[in-house]
Swiss-Prot record:
Protein source organism: Equus caballus
Keyword Membrane carried by entry: yes
Disulphide bridges: 114-196
Lineage of the species this protein comes from: Eukaryota, Metazoa, Chordata, Craniata, Vertebrata
Gene3D superfamilies with a match to the protein in the record: Rhodopsin 7-helix transmembrane proteins
List of glycosylated residues: 18
Name by which UniProt lists this protein: Gonadotropin-releasing hormone receptor
Amino acid sequence: MANSASPEQNQNHCSASNSSIPLTQANLPTLTLSGKIRVTVTFFLFLLSTTFNASFLLKLHKWTQKKENGKKLSKMKVLLKHLTLANLLETLIVMPLDGMWNITVQWYAGELLCKVLSYLKLFSMYAPAFMMVVISLDRSLAITRPLAVKSNSKLGRSMIGLAWLLSSIFAGPQLYIFRMIHLADSSGQTEGFSQCVTHCSFPQWWHQAFYNFFTFSCLFIIPLLFMLICNAKIIFTLTRVLHQDPHKLQLNQSKNNIPRARLRTLKMTVAFATSFTVCWTPYYVLGIWYWFDPEMLNRVSDPVNHFFFLFALLNPCFDPLIYGYFSL
């Protein structure tokens, strides 16, 4: 998870000022073969996602340059622009950080970067999830409340601003709970191994459980519920219109109550939601399993853990491909 750590790193009954914990060399992590494969695939996905998302942003920029009379981007293109920015931010922070951390195994960047990068990591994970909520809400309102949407031209931009603001606020606790710890031998002397973890940040075990559940809910459960509800309302509304007058949904006609372009954006929204759900569900299910059964880490192999994480990283790669497919 975004703020998870190993059981040894999450002891609650300890001094908050303690910066070293007793570990043995046998407990130290190492870069295994599966870890090397994870690093290789992570950097490959980093290049792929950066290329796809940067290309889409460049395409939007060129499109605005060609527009005549200073016309602005459509609302859907503005939403896609911010989703792409969020995906690019996640790509540029999460993927290199994970890849380099797996190579070095321990943390060399110091206390300040431990806190700042932990904050930026969670911020960059919140942003795409919240932007998916904004897109789903906007498309749902466009179908179910079209007059209200037209009368409030600033609604979309307000939701976008709120998504970025909440992402920055909800990631704030990372600056407090993450810190550097050092390996200590039996005599209490540090042995040069350091790590960036949440050790001693939570006075009681349930404090950490609550925070983990909060981040899990904001990153996955709440966005998923919003997307399901919004898409269900869209389907219900379209089904009702179809039953009232089947000719209203004939795509081959130029004059439709629901134009072909709008139906295409609706399909694209559903595809975005499907990509988000399929890519992230295995990763978060594994995280929930670990909360209820910490010994699970000893039963699930490292390659499986690595696969679920890498599968989640496909999401920012898929989004620009989805837009490209529906733009053909």
